[in-house]
Amino acid sequence: MQELLLYGYTVSNYSNKVKLALLLKNIPFKEKRVSPGENDKNINGSPAGLIPYIQHDDFFLSDSQAICEYLEAAFPDSQPLIPSDAKQAAKMRQVISIIETIIDSAARRIYTKKLYSTAPPREVFEEANNRLQRGVRALNRMNCFSNSAILGPNLTLADCAAMATLPLVEEALSDYATESLLKDLSGYSSYYERRMQEEPFIEVENARQKTFRGLARRAGK
């Protein structure tokens, strides 16, 4: 069996979500950098031309959640990142959905300034921030950051999604307000500090910061 290949990009939160899962599960893999848009050339790897995607022997798969679920099933002896309890597993997927479809999708509408030196219109910012804060309130209602990990004592894919997305969102939006737009996310700062004592999260976050700040400098920020 060949070593698993992860095709992705250091700043991509979806690539980093998969990378965190691989590191936490201690699955051997090799990274192949693919810049956004470049993957249109490889229809086998990603039918929609999106990153990340993986190659495991002759099997290709894209979509970060699909990949993470595949890793859980294909490597049953590795550290589990999906709770065995059906209700907890469903809660995990709910948290991931809030992070990715509400917070991340809202943030993407307004952090173009940081990377491309083009600020969105004020009304776009306000609309997107309202949606982002809706996601923050949802995570607070679920007490996501009140324990050592999001769903209790054990790390899950929800933690991979959170640590891949929330630090990026916070940094990318730092030009837009004197305070973090995630300042009302209860317990998040302490949660981030805990995760940054653990090697997989240190590795991924440090690499993300280095690449992101390089992009921001080139954009003149």
Regions found by a protein language model. Give the residues of each.
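Extracytoplasmic ligand-binding clamshell segments of periplasmic binding protein
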Residues: 151, 204-205
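Juxtamembrane helix-loop transition sites at the ends of transmembrane segments
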Residues: 29, 121, 180, 220-221
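GST-like domain detector, emphasizing the conserved glutathione-binding G-site
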Residues: 1-126, 145, 150
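A late-sequence structural motif
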Residues: 198-199, 204
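Short capping/connector residues at structural and topological boundaries
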Residues: 86-87, 155, 206
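GST-like fold's C-terminal all-alpha helical module
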Residues: 103-197
